[in-house]
Swiss-Prot record:
The record's free-text note on cofactor binding: Binds 1 zinc ion per subunit.
UniProt EC number: 6.1.1.5
Homology family: Belongs to the class-I aminoacyl-tRNA synthetase family. IleS type 1 subfamily.
Keyword check for ATP-binding: yes
Known function: Catalyzes the attachment of isoleucine to tRNA(Ile). As IleRS can inadvertently accommodate and process structurally similar amino acids such as valine, to avoid such errors it has two additional distinct tRNA(Ile)-dependent editing activities. One activity is designated as 'pretransfer' editing and involves the hydrolysis of activated Val-AMP. The other activity is designated 'posttransfer' editing and involves deacylation of mischarged Val-tRNA(Ile).
Lineage per the UniProt record: Bacteria, Thermotogati, Thermotogota, Thermotogae, Petrotogales
Superkingdom of origin: Bacteria
Record's protein name: Isoleucine--tRNA ligase
CDD domains assigned to the protein according to its UniProt record, in alphabetical order: Anticodon_Ia_Ile_BEm, IleRS_core
């Protein structure tokens, strides 16, 4: 007789094969159809607000793994918060001004760029930025990121630009903006000033030279300096020594050289000199005020004191050019030294450089070294490879160059100290972020905020044609804000100065009325750093200040986190964020940085096309992102395997609750079998721990906990044990409904817990779940709450012991399988001789059939075992079960085939079949 149709086999249309790359676009279309961001907002509006403010990616090129990682992390946070009942809207944004965009546009134009006006360049830059906003928007949506994609914030929008100028106005009003000539980073290729955050460090090979400066008033005596920038020697006006270091006068032939005593041997070895004698030593302090003669310019160099002089390299006598170095400039201010910077915006020497006029500075190195050698002032020359600042956009080496710029004064009004105090109040994740940003803020120079480019927000400064005064005041800014709010920042470049000024505006210095507008633009970090005001504190959906969270890469300690807190303190006196979370950078499998030249770049689109976005998101969740994160196709394959196990677990749950109506069929906790209560305990422990991990932004723990639960607690333990009960017991029996209640609750809760990480899979599962009052999307549901009364330590300890014994039994069965003694475990009978008294007491509460089900064998008994498998908790004898195999449940039973109504089945199955007929 065929009993196949009497078995409660799993039924579900939830497929084993995910086919994510085909399924995900369908779900995206559904989200589009229901307008999901607005749908969720309408449901959550009125709830506690949670604002994660989006740090704007740069609208330059398509997304890469770094931007994908960042957006997915943000999306995980916001989906979780939405499920927790928060009103957690996501307003994405883009940084759309600045040098990288302008550089790409002008590079593509080539020579044609020189013939275009600033307005024409700006129009091309806007088109370029908007093109990549659209491209990136589609890429982010494809990752499953939910947000107000139809109305993002863009730093080029007039309303945004006006807010930026409002912040600038606050800083001008406080007196913290000044115009000064001091050395700043300058890119000769891009022809603009750069802030620290716009500089990257790469290895660079430089000339390394030791030079003799004749000491005035002493025959044949020279101060020896070392430099890796020979081109800065025309600007030399001083030599710095450390007041507390010991300096030596070294006799070499008929000459006397002065340098730090500790560096004599090293310096002279490099110079190939081994015949020398130290004839005098003295403190650097004694050299202050002495003068040396410049080796090729008709002027003297003053010997000055500076604490930054080190003994790490060089001679302890530091070539000082205030026009080409910040430390040099500070020393120059102290000693009232001349600031010479004989280099133009393109890196060519000016008239001030004398015979080197018109030479490119890098090419002039060779000539300067040649002249020093011919004049007898070159001690030694060579090459050195060292870390050197490069432009973030064109990747060329930058220089320090003294030019007139606008600066934010970080000392006035205790500005820097106020920022440092606010940093202490922020929750930095990880904790080391606080020290990192604090040290950067403490050490950074005044902020150079002007740029000599076209694509950005103009600094509304004017120059008086009568007295030459450059003016930036609140009256002008207020008037320009009104214009830009209506017309956008192009207005500054379109209109004449008089059209941009208030009526009857007069020069505050001379009373003049004729003006010329300046055309410097603001540092792009002012743009993005103002977003707390222009977006978080302004957009209706957000309207929260300070916001709950900023989440970006750790490079933003020197970038957006820093610019934002400086500007927020200027405007409101407080930090713009309560918490700041940082992630590391993407590396390849071997921990190397990704680069096209190494051929190790992994593209997010390639991952999505091969595996689907959920696999990429699972990879994001798997890593402790606070450190650098490795990716490769091998690593992704591991996540594919993890996903497969999770999907199979969910499919099993869905397949076995297809006939379960939670309103009608649920079994109360108190009436459940104890193993079902254990499974609920495991589920609610999972809910508790996963919730804590999400709250702490520890998604790698979520990944681990869920994976562990599915593979160990569910698949290899509970689900294995209950298969017999749910397949074979009566369809509506309490035994089966008890297990189904667990499976149903697990499916509901597990799906919610995976949904922030695997939104596409969770939506697909949600479609297959049967319960009343379902929403259009799982993200409108509420997070599962764990029940404290389910978390019984006593129950856990008891079952830990039982499952430890079960491990022993499974090992014994596996041994017999290897010996070919057994095929299926249901062919076995287990005889146990327990070694543990507590286990004896526990198992005495259950009948032998129940224990056999636990071990997935047909028969079980306690007894003395002379020879058997020695487990940790028992000696185990595995024998063949006695009787015949039941045709329905496959268990072996001595009483199989005893019921004439149901031939070939065991007594249990005969009972079930009778009950089903009579039901």
């Amino acid at each position: 007789m065929d009993y196949k149709d009497t078995i409660n086999l799993p039924k579900t249309s939830f497929k084993m094969k995910a086919n994510l790359k085909e399924k995900e676009p369908q779900i995206l279309q559904k989200w589009e159809d229901i307008n999901i961001a607005y749908y969720l907002r309408n449901i959550r509006i009125g709830g506690t607000k949670f604002v994660l403010h989006d740090g704007p990616p740069y609208a330059n090129g398509d997304i890469h793994m770094g931007t994908a990682l960042n957006k997915v992390l943000k999306d995980i946070v916001l989906k979780y918060k939405t499920l927790r009942g928060y009103d957690a809207p996501y307003v994405p944004g883009w940084d759309t001004h600045g040098l990288p965009i302008e550089h790409n546009v002008t590079t593509k134009l080539g020579e044609k760029a020189n013939a275009l006006s600033k307005l024409e360049i700006r129009k091309l830059c806007e088109d370029y930025a908007m093109k990549y906003v659209d491209i990136q928007r589609e890429s982010f949506k494809r990752l499953g990121v939910i947000g107000f994609w139809d109305k993002p914030y863009l730093t080029l929008k007039p309303e945004y630009e006006a807010k930026v100028l409002e912040i600038l106005r606050s800083i001008v009003e406080s007196g913290n903006i000044y115009r000064g000539t001091k050395p700043i980073y300058w890119c000769t290729e891009c022809q603009t000033a750069l802030a620290e955050a716009e500089v990257e460090y790469h290895d660079h090979t430089s000339d390394s030279i030791y030079v003799k400066f004749p000491l005035v008033g002493e025959n044949n005596t020279y101060v020896i300096i070392w430099t890796t920038t020979p081109w800065t020697l025309p600007a030399n006006v001083a030599i710095a020594v450390h007041p507390n270091f010991d300096y030596a006068k070294v006799e070499i032939g008929n000459e006397y050289w002065i340098m730090a005593k500790e560096l004599v041997d090293k310096t002279l070895k490099e110079a190939g000199i081994d015949d020398y004698k130290i004839i005098d030593t003295f403190k650097g302090l004694t050299l202050e005020g002495e003068k040396a003669r410049h080796p090729f310019v008709d002027r003297e160099s003053l010997l000055v004191l500076a604490d930054y002089v080190t003994l790490d390299e060089g001679t302890g006598c530091v070539h000082t050019a205030p026009g080409h170095g910040m430390e040099d400039y500070i020393t120059g201010t102290k000693y009232n030294l001349q600031v010479i910077s004989p280099v133009d915006s393109q890196g060519y020497f000016t008239d001030e450089a004398g015979k080197y006029k018109g030479m490119k500075i890098w090419e002039a190195n060779k000539e300067i070294i040649k002249d020093l050698k011919e004049n007898g002032f070159l001690v030694q020359s060579g090459k050195i490879t060292h870390s050197y600042p490069h432009c973030w956009r064109c990747k060329n080496p930058v220089i320090f160059r003294a030019t007139p710029q606008w600066f934010i004064d970080l000392e006035k009004n205790n500005y820097r100290e106020k920022v440092l105090e606010e940093i202490k109040k922020v929750n930095w994740i990880p904790k080391w972020g606080e020290n990192r940003i604090s040290s950067m803020v403490r050490e950074r120079p005044d902020w150079v905020i002007s740029r000599q480019r076209a694509w950005g927000i103009p600094i509304p400064a004017i120059k008086c044609e009568n007295c030459g005064e450059t003016i930036l005041d609140t009256k002008i800014i207020d008037h320009v804000i009104e214009i830009i709010e209506k017309e956008g920042s192009n207005a500054w470049f379109e209109k004449e100065a008089k059209e941009l000024l208030p009526n009857d505006y007069r020069c505050p210095k001379c009373g003049g009325s004729e003006f010329k507008k300046e055309e410097d633009i603001l540092d792009v970090w002012i743009d993005s750093g103002s977003s707390f005001e222009a977006v978080a504190n302004s957009r209706e959906e957000l309207k929260k200040f300070p916001v709950d969270l900023y989440l970006e890469g750790s490079d933003q300690h020197r970038g957006w986190f820093q610019s934002s807190i400086f500007l927020s303190v200027a405007k409101h006196g407080i930090a713009p964020y309560e918490s700041v979370l940082t992630h590391g950078f993407i590396k390849d499998e071997e921990g190397k940085k990704m680069s096209k030249s190494l051929g190790n770049v992994v593209n997010p689109k390639d991952i999505i096309n091969k595996y689907g976005a959920d696999i990429l998101r699972l990879w994001v969740a798997s890593a402790d992102y606070r450190m650098d994160i490795k990716i490769s196709y091998n690593i992704l394959e591991q996540q594919v395997e993890t996903y497969r196990k999770l999907r199979n677990t969910i499919r099993f749950l869905l397949g076995n609750i297809n006939d379960f109506d939670p309103d009608e069929d649920s079994v109360a906790y108190e009436e459940m079998l104890e193993i079902d209560q254990w499974a609920l305990m495991k589920l609610h422990n999972l809910i508790k721990n996963v919730t804590k991990a999400y709250d702490n932004y520890e998604f790698y723990k979520v990944h681990y906990l869920i994976n562990n639960f599915c593979t160990i607690d569910m698949s290899s333990t509970y689900l294995d044990i209950i298969k017999d009960r749910i397949y074979v017991e009566g369809k509506k029996s309490k035994l089966r409904r008890s297990a189904q209640t667990v499976l149903y609750e697990t499916a509901i809760a597990l799906n919610k817990m995976i949904s922030p990480i695997l939104p596409f899979t969770a939506e697909e599962v949600y479609e297959h779940l049967n319960y009343s009052n379902k929403y259009e999307t799982i993200f409108a549901e509420l997070w599962p709450e764990y029940k404290e009364n389910y978390l019984s330590e006593e129950l856990e300890e008891k079952w830990n012991k039982i499952f430890a014994l079960r491990e022993d039994v499974l090992k014994a069965l596996e041994e017999k399988r290897k010996e070919k003694f057994l095929g299926n475990s249901l062919d076995a009978k287990i005889i146990l001789n327990l070694k543990d008294d507590t286990l004896k007491q526990i198992l005495s509460q259950y009948d032998n059939n129940w224990i056999a089900d636990l071990f997935i064998v047909s028969q079980f008994e306690f007894g003395n075992v002379d020879e058997g498998f020695e487990g940790r908790y028992a000696t185990i004898k595995v024998t063949k079960a006695e009787g015949e195999k039941c045709e329905r449940c496959w268990k072996v039973d001595p009483n199989t085939d005893n019921d004439p109504d149901f031939p070939g089945v065991c007594p249990r199955c005969a009972r079930v079949l009778k009950e089903e007929i009579n039901a």
